[in-house]
Amino acid sequence: MNPILVLLCVIALGLLVGRVSFRGISLGTSAILFVALLAGHYGWTIPTGFGTLGLALFVYCVGISAGPTFFRGLASHGRAMAITGSVIVLTGVAVTWTSARLLGLPAELAGGLMAGAMTSTPALGAITQSSSDPAAVAVGFGVAYPIGIIAVVLFVQIAIKLFAKPGDSDGTDSASETSGQSSAEIAESNSIGRRVVRIANPVVSGKRPSDIVAFADSPCQMSRVQREGRWRPTPPDYQFEIGDDVMLVGGASEIRRVSETLGELQDTAEPVVDADRERRYVVVTSPEIYGRTLKELRLRSKYGVTIVRVQRHDVEFVPSARTRIEFGDGLVAVGEPDALAKIANAVGHRPRTVNETDLLSLVAGIVLGIFVGNLSLQIGEFSMSLGIAGGPLMVGLILGHFRRLGPIRGSYPPAAMLLMTEGGLALFLADAGLNAGANVVEVLMERGAMLCVAAAAIAIIPLLVGFAGSRYFGGRTLWQSLGATCGGMTSTPGLAVLTGATDSSQPATSYVAAYPVALVLITVAAPWLVELIG
């Protein structure tokens, strides 16, 4: 069969299998590896080079995506969650090394087990490219990956049942170290709603929304005021008056919290608004906007608009005054038509700038990353290099943070980023699985039970250490600790279980702080661990 056709068929079938969901859990793009292992077992092959190209593209895009939050998280209040993520990764490294020594596992097989148990495809790529036996790495990953996913999901469910107290699911978020961090108010889009509140508290009468502490601390926005029977965007000079009906946008728990300060929630029909003329989606490209909080920008007083939602990395959330706007954020603004035109120009919304993909910058960035990855540092008899995975990852992180290095741009449209990330990962997984498929049955027959035991240990022990450290030594809440633990394990399914169990923004807040640090650390540490074991 034509090798290119084999590659495309494996990817297509893998993506179809990845869509199969059982109780909310699916393999996603990683299912391509399992289909490729099966195809490789029956002798299907593809030309060399596809996997290397796919890996370089994948990790470079991962770096670009993580760059804006990675360095800021290390230097901000999210540091505590980043430490939790680091502890989890280092514990995973230690458990992997111990398991390899006790069970006599080959270094490459042990490295694949760690990447799978920690559900980290970038780590799989880093080990594969630096390994002398990439087939063993792929087999180890294939065995451990399902175990890693199930372990995190079950751990989160059990922890919630054991430690959650009545009322915890209401998600009342106290001020915490993560409250001022970028993306701190992320919430699942299906939990965002609108409610009408009637002003009844004399204390707020005559005050502006910006004067109310509840708005500053909560991911909840007041978008409209009812005037003469019509819902109008909140004017810049609006002051609360007893009897006013206002519209709040946010999660159910946050709306309840703010309404307790303002007055009484109203059980009314869905308000009718002029969304076509009084709401606009704009994308941030102006350096005068990104990197600053909504409180610092004062968009309502300057332009007469309210930012009711922010879309970042395919996640939509309601911001608070402390939310820091980032380059490429999609903002949903509510205001009068002329005010919306002004805010569109102010944030730098230019369709061509937002939607164009600079291919020259993409190629130059990957080439620079490969060059950096080939540089080696000699320490005695031990030689270290970032390799084909670590080099593009580091360059991507730097470009993602600074957005530009000379002529090389570090930002791409969200749709293009998703396509390049998923496309690169698909090429790499297909190549790795097809090359490893010939030996998969032999390895499983020889070490199957042993591999499952090691994978379970590598997945479970870091979970326990990370959660206990954050909860009992770090003094974090249950939701913060579980969010950071899922981030340290780079487990999106675990986060999905958390966000389904609470309206609180704390799980996603902590996940966002821990995830990029854990992702980078495990990608860099994984190939060095293999050398250490070997």
From Swiss-Prot:
Bias (Polar residues): 172-187
Keywords: Cell membrane, Membrane, Repeat, Transmembrane, Transmembrane helix, Transport
Keyword Transport: yes
Protein's membrane topology: Multi-pass membrane protein
PROSITE patterns in the record: RCK_C
Pfam families the UniProt entry points to: Asp-Al_Ex (PF06826), TrkA_C (PF02080)
Domain RCK C-terminal: residue ranges: 180-264, 265-349
Subcellular location: Cell membrane
Annotated segments matching region Disordered: 167-187
Gene Ontology MF terms in the entry: monoatomic cation transmembrane transporter activity
UniProt superkingdom: Bacteria
GO biological process, alphabetically ordered: potassium ion transport
Any one annotated GO CC term: plasma membrane
InterPro entries: AAE_transporter, RCK_C, RCK_C_sf, YidE_YbjL
Residues that span the membrane, as ranges: 4-22, 24-46, 56-75, 82-104, 134-156, 359-378, 382-401, 408-430, 445-467, 479-501, 511-533
Gene3D superfamilies registered for this protein in UniProt: Regulator of K+ conductance, C-terminal domain
NCBIfam families attached to this UniProt entry: YidE_YbjL_dupl
Family as reported in the entry's similarity comment: Belongs to the AAE transporter (TC 2.A.81) family.
Record protein name field: Uncharacterized transporter RB4869
UniProt organism field: Rhodopirellula baltica (strain DSM 10527 / NCIMB 13988 / SH1)
